[in-house]
Amino acid sequence: MSDVLSKKQQFSLKKLNKSLRKSTGQAIADYNMIEEGDRVMVCLSGGKDSFTMLDILLELRAAAPIHFEIIAVNLDQKQPDFPEHILPEYLQKLGVDYKIVEEDTYSIVQDKIPEGKTTCSLCSRLRRGILYRTAKELGATKIALGHHRDDLLATLMLNMFFGGKLKSMPAKLVSDNGEHVVIRPLAYCKEKEIEAYAKLKEYPIIPCNLCGSQPNLQRQVTKNMLNEWDVKFPGRLETMFTAMQNVVPSHLSDTALFNFKEIDKSSGVIDGGDLAFDKEPIKHHTEDITPIETQYYQQHQAVKIKQLT
């Protein structure tokens, strides 16, 4: 990060840091993500989200009433022109324990996936397997991923549009192989705050030229839609995320979640009866949004949306 920031930038950085720490700390507490004696493997991709996650977790650890370890892990997938020196230099300067895992998944993906097809599915499966193995080797008790609130919302929309499910990314889960606990400490954090924070911190961002840059991904299209909503209808994403934490099974249609067959007059009114829409507005904490972060997002993200449409 530059040694010299303007007073306005310093103020914005302080506000963003406070907001991100608060959101991350709240998510950790709500889901009991980190416990006494944990060894947390922080998956560092080189993107803005994982840099921010590592930064905030280190700060929270310094002030936490419990003791836990942090080790940063990066998977070098041998993509062409991958700058191998950046992360080791950054982590050494930061003074954090780390491990670089070298696995040529790039060649496997290129060999198996036809040209023009999205590579994310195979790439993510290979990456998960390697990270699970590494966590076991390191004795990690938790695996921390850098997905944020907007990722959770995009996944919810993707599953609704293309999977026929009301399903998102959980903030905490057991890994596919049943051997690890995976956590998402940034689950409550807004992407636009992370983006503004990373810009001010001047992290050495490493772009993903394997999957993240593919413009035809359904996920990217869905995120663009959500970003457009956020610009046109401020507060909509906050309301959507609140809905994910305020599920009413009796007013959905999943018989596995609610026993509709047993309902009769003696059951009484359940969760408001036949009110299909509760008109009481959701209150948002918009005062936590910093002016510089909002201005940066509106100027840059609106341009991206316009270009895509």
Swiss-Prot record:
GO terms for biological process: tRNA thio-modification. It comes from the Bacteria. One of its GO terms (molecular function) is ATP binding. It is an enzyme of class 2 (transferase). It is found in: Cytoplasm. Pfam families: ATP_bind_3. Its main location: cytoplasm. [4Fe-4S] cluster binds at residues 120, 123, 211. It catalyses: cytidine(32) in tRNA + S-sulfanyl-L-cysteinyl-[cysteine desulfurase] + AH2 + ATP = 2-thiocytidine(32) in tRNA + L-cysteinyl-[cysteine desulfurase] + A + AMP + diphosphate + H(+). A motif (PP-loop motif) lies at residues 45-50. Keywords: 4Fe-4S, ATP-binding, Cytoplasm, Iron, Iron-sulfur, Magnesium, Metal-binding, Nucleotide-binding, RNA-binding, Transferase, tRNA processing, tRNA-binding. GO terms for cellular component: cytoplasm. Pathway: tRNA modification. Its EC number is 2.8.1.-. Binds 1 [4Fe-4S] cluster per subunit. The cluster is chelated by three Cys residues, the fourth Fe has a free coordination site that may bind a sulfur atom transferred from the persulfide of IscS. Its cofactor is Mg(2+); [4Fe-4S] cluster. Catalyzes the ATP-dependent 2-thiolation of cytidine in position 32 of tRNA, to form 2-thiocytidine (s(2)C32). The sulfur atoms are provided by the cysteine/cysteine desulfurase (IscS) system. The thiolation reaction likely consists of two steps: a first activation step by ATP to form an adenylated intermediate of the target base of tRNA, and a second nucleophilic substitution step of the sulfur (S) atom supplied by the hydrosulfide attached to the Fe-S cluster. Homodimer. Belongs to the TtcA family. This is tRNA-cytidine(32) 2-sulfurtransferase. The lineage of its organism: Bacteria, Pseudomonadati, Pseudomonadota, Gammaproteobacteria, Alteromonadales.
